Amino acid sequence: MSEIFNALPGIEVEVGAIAKSLAHMWEATAASGRAAPASNDVRATQANVVLHLGFNTTPADALEQFQTMLRFSQRYPSRVVVLCPLKEEHGATEMRAKIYGECFLGRSKGDTRCVEFVMLSYPIAARQRLEDQVSICLSTDLPLYYWVHRFLTTQRMADYTYLLSRAKRVLIDSATAPADTLAYPWPNPAALRDLVYSRLLPVRQTVGQFLAGYSPEILVDGLKAVTVRHGGELAAEARVTLGWLQRRLAACGATVQDIAFADETDGNGKFEIHFAYGTAGKFFHWAGDLTTRHAMFEADFGSGPATLPAPVSLLAPEWALSEAMFF
């Protein structure tokens, strides 16, 4: 993981001088005429985010998540601590630190939104000291959000209980997380948020709004099967969508044990939802193309066929983050 730490932007500083180095960085930024947070501007930072890069992270992926946090912070100013663990065979015994800061000017005068990054590279042997160092880097009066990214295994999660327990939200991405992630005994399950579910918000909204035009009784009467078809790259999105449909249909009064729920891999590049009924001619079908961002509804619930074109997309990564954190 030293290659990840080395690939991330920033200025390397002494671990024991992070706060002083951040202050000097902003002083130099302001002196050069660039945007910097005012010392009394409480709006300049609004959240603590710990981005924990697991051993499945590549340097390119780490940079992508760094850029996601930069875009996120243009709307939600943040202090971000990026954790870069080192494998035991690396041989390092000490932590290393980098800092990075950037401010964005808002629409009104005095609306400055800033992000501060502290990157910490640490060997597993130094993990016991990590808690104190992370605590020093965070703003004590702001909420903490813990983003667990591409861990190789959940076995190490117990080593970070202090973050899991303190965080207002714990963020995972079940598309890239270990297979047993959702079954892990999280200290605070209510805080867990899946970024797959979050980025599906536009799909959930458009499908939900269409189906809301019919009574729950009509939707569930005679329902025999619910199928989600998808390309292989959308397997996680299909699984999460199927679970969402099952919960919503149960809320409509369906006996879900009597309905066949399935997801099928399809090579046509579309993301599709199909309801099959025991009544001849009754059906619901939605097909979305995430490349062209076009979708089509087709349905007949007994009152005649209906078709409706609609837009479709997944949330951008920074918007999925905000959805998972705050909603």
Predicted features, each with a name:
Residues 1-11, 21, 25-40, 45-47, ...:
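C-terminal structured domains
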Residues 1-146:
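An N-terminal, globular interaction/scaffold subdomain
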Residues 57-60, 234-236, 278-287:
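Short, surface-exposed beta-strand/loop "edge" segments at domain boundaries and coil↔beta transitions
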Residues 62, 93, 130, 155-158, ...:
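A short acidic (Asp/Glu
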Residues 68-71, 134-136, 161-164, 242-246:
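Short, solvent-exposed amphipathic alpha-helical segments in soluble enzyme
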Residues 79-88, 147-150, 174-176, 252-266:
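A generic structural motif
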Residues 116-215:
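Conserved, well-structured core segments that form the ligand-binding/active-site neighborhood
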Residues 177, 182-270:
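A contiguous, surface-oriented mixed alpha/beta subdomain in the mid-to-C-terminal portion of proteins
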